[in-house]
């Protein structure tokens, strides 16, 4: 899980979602997991 100021899709499988008011990226590739913070 990467914590970043700006979350971006890193590949076509990445999905940008909101959970509990936080913007997150979920993907089949675990390296692409990010959240904003």
UniProtKB/Swiss-Prot annotation:
Main location group: plastid
Subcellular localization: Plastid, Chloroplast
Record Pfam families: Ribosomal_L36
SUPFAM superfamilies with a match to the protein in the record: Ribosomal protein L36 (SSF57840)
Keywords associated with the record: Chloroplast, Plastid, Ribonucleoprotein, Ribosomal protein
A Gene Ontology term for the protein's cellular component: ribosome
InterPro entries according to UniProt: Ribosomal_bL36, Ribosomal_bL36_sp
Highest taxon listed in the record's lineage: Eukaryota
Alphabetical GO biological process terms: translation
Gene Ontology terms, MF aspect: structural constituent of ribosome
UniProt family annotation: Belongs to the bacterial ribosomal protein bL36 family.
Protein name: Large ribosomal subunit protein bL36c
């Amino acid at each position: 899980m990467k914590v970043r100021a700006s979350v971006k899709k890193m590949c076509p499988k990445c999905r940008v979602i909101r959970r509990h008011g936080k913007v997150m990226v979920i993907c089949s590739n675990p390296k692409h997991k990010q959240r904003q913070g």
